[in-house]
Protein backbone atom coordinates (compact mmCIF):
# COMPACT_ATOMS: atom_id res chain seq x y z
CA UNK A 1 0.00 0.00 0.00
CA UNK A 2 2.65 2.53 1.02
CA UNK A 3 4.99 1.65 -1.85
CA UNK A 4 2.12 1.90 -4.36
CA UNK A 5 1.27 5.40 -3.14
CA UNK A 6 4.94 6.42 -3.26
CA UNK A 7 5.27 5.16 -6.85
CA UNK A 8 2.28 7.28 -7.86
CA UNK A 9 3.84 10.40 -6.39
CA UNK A 10 1.33 10.62 -3.53
CA UNK A 11 3.91 10.66 -0.75
CA UNK A 12 5.22 11.23 1.69
CA UNK A 13 2.96 8.59 3.20
CA UNK A 14 2.33 8.73 6.94
CA UNK A 15 0.95 5.96 9.12
CA UNK A 16 -0.99 6.47 12.34
CA UNK A 17 -1.60 4.03 15.19
CA UNK A 18 -2.33 3.98 18.92
CA UNK A 19 -1.45 2.09 22.07
CA UNK A 20 -3.65 1.76 25.12
CA UNK A 21 -7.12 1.89 23.60
CA UNK A 22 -8.21 -1.23 25.49
CA UNK A 23 -6.50 -0.39 28.79
CA UNK A 24 -8.48 0.71 31.83
CA UNK A 25 -5.55 2.69 33.29
CA UNK A 26 -2.90 5.05 31.98
CA UNK A 27 -2.81 7.29 28.93
CA UNK A 28 -3.79 6.67 25.35
CA UNK A 29 -0.71 7.19 23.16
CA UNK A 30 -1.02 7.95 19.45
CA UNK A 31 1.87 8.18 16.99
CA UNK A 32 2.23 9.26 13.39
CA UNK A 33 5.24 8.36 11.27
CA UNK A 34 6.32 9.10 7.71
CA UNK A 35 9.06 6.94 6.22
CA UNK A 36 11.20 7.43 3.15
CA UNK A 37 10.33 5.24 0.14
CA UNK A 38 11.81 1.78 0.65
CA UNK A 39 12.38 2.18 4.39
CA UNK A 40 9.96 -0.63 5.16
CA UNK A 41 12.33 -3.11 3.52
CA UNK A 42 15.37 -1.61 5.24
CA UNK A 43 13.96 -1.77 8.78
CA UNK A 44 14.54 -5.44 9.53
CA UNK A 45 11.73 -7.03 11.53
CA UNK A 46 9.35 -4.05 11.37
CA UNK A 47 5.76 -5.21 11.93
CA UNK A 48 2.83 -4.76 14.30
CA UNK A 49 4.30 -3.89 17.71
CA UNK A 50 2.02 -6.39 19.47
CA UNK A 51 3.78 -9.36 17.86
CA UNK A 52 7.29 -8.09 18.66
CA UNK A 53 9.21 -8.85 21.84
CA UNK A 54 9.99 -5.90 24.14
CA UNK A 55 13.64 -6.04 23.06
CA UNK A 56 12.69 -5.98 19.37
CA UNK A 57 10.36 -3.03 19.95
CA UNK A 58 13.09 -1.08 21.73
CA UNK A 59 15.58 -1.78 18.92
CA UNK A 60 13.13 -0.69 16.23
CA UNK A 61 12.09 2.35 18.25
CA UNK A 62 15.68 3.62 18.15
CA UNK A 63 15.97 2.90 14.41
CA UNK A 64 12.71 4.70 13.64
CA UNK A 65 13.67 7.68 15.80
CA UNK A 66 16.97 7.97 13.92
CA UNK A 67 15.79 7.35 10.36
CA UNK A 68 12.13 8.33 9.97
CA UNK A 69 11.36 11.20 7.63
CA UNK A 70 9.07 12.67 10.28
CA UNK A 71 7.34 11.45 13.43
CA UNK A 72 5.21 12.69 16.29
CA UNK A 73 3.85 11.12 19.46
CA UNK A 74 0.78 12.36 21.35
CA UNK A 75 -0.01 11.37 24.94
CA UNK A 76 -3.64 11.72 26.03
CA UNK A 77 -3.89 11.30 29.82
CA UNK A 78 -6.56 9.26 31.56
CA UNK A 79 -8.57 12.30 32.64
CA UNK A 80 -8.86 13.50 29.04
CA UNK A 81 -9.86 10.00 27.91
CA UNK A 82 -12.62 10.11 30.53
CA UNK A 83 -13.77 13.55 29.41
CA UNK A 84 -13.87 12.72 25.69
CA UNK A 85 -14.61 8.98 25.70
CA UNK A 86 -12.09 6.51 24.32
CA UNK A 87 -13.20 6.59 20.67
CA UNK A 88 -13.31 10.39 20.44
CA UNK A 89 -9.97 10.62 22.26
CA UNK A 90 -8.47 8.17 19.77
CA UNK A 91 -9.68 10.16 16.76
CA UNK A 92 -8.52 13.44 18.29
CA UNK A 93 -5.11 11.96 19.09
CA UNK A 94 -4.67 10.83 15.49
CA UNK A 95 -5.54 14.29 14.19
CA UNK A 96 -3.06 15.90 16.59
CA UNK A 97 -0.32 13.43 15.69
CA UNK A 98 -0.65 14.05 11.94
CA UNK A 99 -0.85 17.83 12.48
CA UNK A 100 2.44 17.79 14.42
CA UNK A 101 4.46 16.03 11.72
CA UNK A 102 7.25 18.31 10.52
CA UNK A 103 6.62 17.16 6.93
CA UNK A 104 3.10 17.50 5.54
CA UNK A 105 2.00 14.04 4.34
CA UNK A 106 0.60 13.53 0.88
CA UNK A 107 -1.41 10.57 2.14
CA UNK A 108 -2.23 9.08 5.54
CA UNK A 109 -2.83 5.40 6.31
CA UNK A 110 -4.83 4.54 9.42
CA UNK A 111 -5.13 1.16 11.08
CA UNK A 112 -8.56 -0.35 10.55
CA UNK A 113 -11.00 2.57 10.61
CA UNK A 114 -11.51 5.90 8.91
CA UNK A 115 -10.40 9.07 10.68
CA UNK A 116 -12.00 12.28 9.39
CA UNK A 117 -10.23 15.63 9.61
CA UNK A 118 -6.63 14.53 9.10
CA UNK A 119 -5.80 17.39 6.76
CA UNK A 120 -4.65 15.03 3.98
CA UNK A 121 -6.22 12.27 1.88
CA UNK A 122 -6.42 9.09 3.92
CA UNK A 123 -7.45 5.46 3.73
CA UNK A 124 -8.22 2.92 6.44
CA UNK A 125 -6.18 -0.25 6.03
CA UNK A 126 -7.36 -3.49 7.64
CA UNK A 127 -4.50 -4.79 9.80
CA UNK A 128 -2.52 -1.77 8.66
CA UNK A 129 0.24 -2.39 11.20
CA UNK A 130 0.93 -5.72 9.48
CA UNK A 131 0.83 -4.56 5.85
CA UNK A 132 2.05 -0.94 5.85
CA UNK A 133 5.52 -0.09 7.15
CA UNK A 134 4.59 3.45 8.20
CA UNK A 135 1.65 2.18 10.29
CA UNK A 136 3.87 -0.50 11.84
CA UNK A 137 6.44 2.18 12.69
CA UNK A 138 3.73 4.30 14.31
CA UNK A 139 2.57 1.29 16.33
CA UNK A 140 6.10 0.73 17.64
CA UNK A 141 6.52 4.39 18.60
CA UNK A 142 3.18 4.43 20.42
CA UNK A 143 3.69 1.10 22.18
CA UNK A 144 7.22 1.78 23.42
CA UNK A 145 6.30 5.27 24.60
CA UNK A 146 3.28 4.01 26.50
CA UNK A 147 5.09 1.04 28.03
CA UNK A 148 7.77 3.39 29.37
CA UNK A 149 5.09 5.65 30.86
CA UNK A 150 3.36 2.69 32.52
CA UNK A 151 6.66 1.47 33.97
CA UNK A 152 7.13 4.94 35.45
CA UNK A 153 3.60 4.90 36.88
CA UNK A 154 4.45 1.63 38.60
CA UNK A 155 6.95 3.56 40.71
CA UNK A 156 4.14 5.89 41.84
CA UNK A 157 1.47 3.21 42.28
CA UNK A 158 3.28 -0.10 42.89
CA UNK A 159 0.23 -1.96 44.26
CA UNK A 160 -1.33 -2.24 40.79
CA UNK A 161 1.53 -3.88 38.89
CA UNK A 162 1.45 -1.42 35.99
CA UNK A 163 4.93 -2.54 34.94
CA UNK A 164 3.56 -6.00 34.13
CA UNK A 165 0.11 -5.56 32.57
CA UNK A 166 0.57 -1.95 31.42
CA UNK A 167 -2.92 -1.00 32.56
CA UNK A 168 -4.80 -3.59 30.49
CA UNK A 169 -7.70 -5.59 31.93
CA UNK A 170 -5.83 -8.74 32.89
CA UNK A 171 -7.00 -11.00 35.70
CA UNK A 172 -4.07 -9.80 37.83
CA UNK A 173 -4.93 -6.14 37.28
CA UNK A 174 -8.61 -6.79 38.00
CA UNK A 175 -7.72 -8.51 41.28
CA UNK A 176 -5.46 -5.63 42.36
CA UNK A 177 -8.07 -3.07 41.31
CA UNK A 178 -10.72 -4.89 43.35
CA UNK A 179 -8.42 -5.06 46.38
CA UNK A 180 -7.21 -1.47 46.39
CA UNK A 181 -9.77 0.49 44.40
CA UNK A 182 -8.78 2.77 41.50
CA UNK A 183 -6.11 5.47 41.56
CA UNK A 184 -6.00 8.73 39.63
CA UNK A 185 -4.50 6.96 36.61
CA UNK A 186 -7.49 4.64 36.15
CA UNK A 187 -10.13 5.44 33.54
CA UNK A 188 -13.57 5.96 35.02
CA UNK A 189 -15.20 5.33 31.64
CA UNK A 190 -14.60 1.60 32.17
CA UNK A 191 -17.16 -0.55 33.97
CA UNK A 192 -14.57 -2.54 35.92
CA UNK A 193 -13.05 0.65 37.35
CA UNK A 194 -16.47 1.94 38.43
CA UNK A 195 -17.34 -1.44 39.98
CA UNK A 196 -14.08 -1.56 41.95
CA UNK A 197 -14.59 2.02 43.13
CA UNK A 198 -18.07 1.20 44.42
CA UNK A 199 -16.63 -1.60 46.56
CA UNK A 200 -14.51 1.04 48.31
CA UNK A 201 -17.19 3.74 48.47
CA UNK A 202 -15.31 5.89 45.96
CA UNK A 203 -16.79 8.34 43.45
CA UNK A 204 -15.31 9.55 40.19
CA UNK A 205 -12.94 12.48 40.83
CA UNK A 206 -13.71 14.03 37.45
CA UNK A 207 -16.30 14.47 34.74
CA UNK A 208 -16.72 11.36 32.62
CA UNK A 209 -18.17 11.18 29.12
CA UNK A 210 -21.66 9.67 29.10
CA UNK A 211 -21.66 8.66 25.45
CA UNK A 212 -23.43 5.29 24.99
CA UNK A 213 -21.22 2.24 25.28
CA UNK A 214 -18.16 3.97 26.69
CA UNK A 215 -18.64 2.52 30.17
CA UNK A 216 -18.20 -1.02 28.91
CA UNK A 217 -14.97 -2.98 28.91
CA UNK A 218 -15.42 -5.22 25.88
CA UNK A 219 -14.41 -8.87 25.75
CA UNK A 220 -11.78 -7.97 23.17
CA UNK A 221 -10.16 -5.60 25.67
CA UNK A 222 -9.38 -8.44 28.10
CA UNK A 223 -5.92 -9.81 27.34
CA UNK A 224 -3.26 -12.05 28.81
CA UNK A 225 0.08 -10.63 29.94
CA UNK A 226 1.77 -12.60 27.16
CA UNK A 227 -0.05 -10.44 24.57
CA UNK A 228 1.27 -7.14 25.93
From Swiss-Prot:
Does Metal-binding appear among the keywords?
yes
Q: How is the cofactor bound?
A: Manganese or magnesium. Binds 1 divalent metal ion per monomer in the absence of substrate. May bind a second metal ion after substrate binding.
Q: Which UniProt keywords apply?
A: Cytoplasm, Endonuclease, Hydrolase, Manganese, Metal-binding, Nuclease
Annotated residues that bind a divalent metal cation are located at 17-18, 111
One Pfam family cited in the UniProt record for this chain: RNase_HII
Q: Does the keyword Nuclease apply?
A: yes
Any one GO CC term of the record: ribonuclease H2 complex
**Catalysed reaction(s)?**
Endonucleolytic cleavage to 5'-phosphomonoester
Q: Which NCBIfam families match?
A: PRK00015.1-3, PRK00015.2-2
- What is the purpose of this protein? Endonuclease that specifically degrades the RNA of RNA-DNA hybrids.
Per the similarity annotation, which family is this? Answer: Belongs to the RNase HII family.
- The protein's name in its UniProt record: Ribonuclease HII
From which organism does this entry originate? Saccharopolyspora erythraea (strain ATCC 11635 / DSM 40517 / JCM 4748 / NBRC 13426 / NCIMB 8594 / NRRL 2338)
Lineage of producing organism: Bacteria, Bacillati, Actinomycetota, Actinomycetes, Pseudonocardiales
Amino acid sequence: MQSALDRRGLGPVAGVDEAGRGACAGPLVVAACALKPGDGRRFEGLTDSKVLSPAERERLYDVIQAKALSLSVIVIPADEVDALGIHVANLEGMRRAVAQLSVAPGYVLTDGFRVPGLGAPSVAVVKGDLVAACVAAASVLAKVTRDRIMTGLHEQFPVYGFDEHKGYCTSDHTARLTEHGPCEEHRWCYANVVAAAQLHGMRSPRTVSSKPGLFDAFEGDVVDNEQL
